[in-house]
């Protein structure tokens, strides 16, 4: 099993290109199931999760071709041969559940295994089921699979979600594009990935309004056609690499970065003593003189502070001056990186959904273990500024969400290498 060796060194300087958004691409790919015409995605990230979604779509009979070194995905669902998403593929990645809505809308039936992915809490499917049932779907759980059918087709409805779930919003919006009549989704998630999905669906002929707000209205159409769509910049990769110069010092330009994707995160960086400036090519990040200042962080749905940057932010605050409090309100059990950071000398106390971080002057390198995708990169960031060597094991998580992480950090001066296991 591979590991990554990080040696603490000085400031980082240079440029890092930001890839297309993993979470957007994993939503856009199942949209091909809604049409019998080709869908092409450009600016696709090159990640293991994308390969998993490719295998899933191919198992349903879709054609998926990876072009231009994986940056372009050409897909066609002209001849679907199955409506069953098997456990062997779905167990590897939670986003597999996003084939449920599209298959139900186009085929009138779908059988989807309960999903897998990172071990960060229950993350139930209840909200997805409630949303699709509101459109007239009949869904039951048998033998670990969701069996869904809509023999008379889906019908538009007004539905208010109990929680602004990103995945449930995506599933319902895709399903509603082919439903009869008008669907109004209230308390919808507002994430940029949903805005990107709607832009793609609109290019395919869908009639949708309100993306980026808490109320989305979809007027169902008889069919969708093909389209070409550019995947939005990955705001989580962007935020992650913004933290590299914040932790190590120096000045790094993030190519393709956009402030509107990371607003609440940038506010916390500013409060901690980090400067972020827009450039012609993206965003430039540098740390003001001295140690960063402690800040309190509460994770919230967009446009609040993203849960997917909480672990990386904790790595920064481990060496802040003062005491920081991080409150996790999106997922349970998402402080599994805290004990590993403690092995490096961090002072962290976790009580339920709250972590208290008392800053120390410097962390010390140590062998640590990645427990999930974002935890793995937080340990790498911590190691960049730690004294000595940090060996991060179980980095297979990393390949699910970051392309060429070693090369990108090396390019700005980090001392980092991947060790094959």
From Swiss-Prot:
Keyword Ligase: no
Top-level EC class: transferase
Pfam family, one: EPSP_synthase
Main location: cytoplasm
Assigned GO CC terms: cytoplasm
Annotated compartments: Cytoplasm
Active-site annotation: 118 (proton donor)
Protein name (record): UDP-N-acetylglucosamine 1-carboxyvinyltransferase
Reactions it catalyzes: phosphoenolpyruvate + UDP-N-acetyl-alpha-D-glucosamine = UDP-N-acetyl-3-O-(1-carboxyvinyl)-alpha-D-glucosamine + phosphate
One biological process term in Gene Ontology: peptidoglycan biosynthetic process
PANTHER family: UDP-N-ACETYLGLUCOSAMINE 1-CARBOXYVINYLTRANSFERASE
HAMAP family per record: MurA
């Amino acid at each position: 099993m591979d590991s990554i060796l990080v040696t603490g060194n000085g400031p980082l300087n240079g440029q890092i290109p930001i890839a297309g958004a993993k979470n957007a691409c994993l939503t856009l790919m199942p949209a091909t199931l809604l049409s019998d015409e080709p869908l092409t995605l450009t600016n696709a990230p090159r990640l293991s999760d994308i390969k998993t979604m490719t295998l899933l779509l191919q198992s349903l009979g879709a054609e998926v071709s990876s072009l231009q070194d994986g940056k372009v995905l050409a897909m066609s669902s002209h001849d679907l041969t199955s409506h069953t998403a098997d456990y062997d593929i779905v167990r590897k990645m939670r986003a597999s559940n996003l084939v449920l809505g599209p298959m139900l809308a186009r085929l009138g039936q779908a059988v989807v295994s309960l999903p897998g992915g990172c071990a960060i809490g229950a993350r139930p499917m209840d909200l997805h089921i409630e949303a699709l049932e509101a459109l007239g779907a009949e869904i039951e759980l048998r033998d670990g699979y969701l069996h869904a059918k809509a023999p008379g087709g889906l019908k538009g409805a007004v539905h208010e979600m109990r929680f602004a779930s990103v995945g449930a919003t995506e599933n319902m919006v895709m399903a509603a594009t082919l439903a009869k009549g008008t669907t109004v989704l209230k308390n919808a998630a507002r994430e940029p990935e949903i805005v990107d999905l709607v832009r793609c669906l609109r290019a395919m002929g869908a009639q949708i309004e309100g993306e980026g707000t808490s109320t989305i209205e979809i007027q169902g159409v008889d069919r969708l056609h093909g389209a070409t769509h550019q995947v939005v910049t990955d705001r989580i990769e962007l935020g992650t690499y913004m933290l590299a110069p914040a932790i190590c010092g120096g000045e790094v330009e993030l190519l393709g970065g956009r402030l509107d994707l990371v607003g609440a995160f940038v506010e916390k960086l500013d409060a901690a003593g980090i400067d972020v400036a827009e450039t012609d090519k993206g965003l430039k990040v540098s740390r003001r003189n001295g140690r960063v200042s402690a800040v309190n962080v509460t994770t919230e749905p967009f446009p609040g502070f993203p849960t997917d940057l909480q672990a990386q932010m904790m790595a920064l605050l481990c060496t802040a001056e003062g005491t920081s409090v991080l409150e996790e309100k999106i997922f349970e059990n998402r402080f599994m990186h805290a004990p590993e950071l403690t092995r490096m000398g961090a002072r962290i106390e976790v009580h339920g959904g709250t972590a208290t971080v008392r800053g120390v002057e410097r962390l010390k390198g140590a062998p640590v273990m990645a427990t999930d995708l974002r935890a793995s990169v937080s340990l790498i960031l911590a190691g960049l500024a730690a004294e000595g060597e940090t060996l991060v094991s179980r980095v297979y998580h990393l390949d699910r969400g970051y392309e060429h992480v070693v090369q990108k950090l090396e390019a700005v001066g980090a001392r980092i290498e991947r060790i094959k296991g």
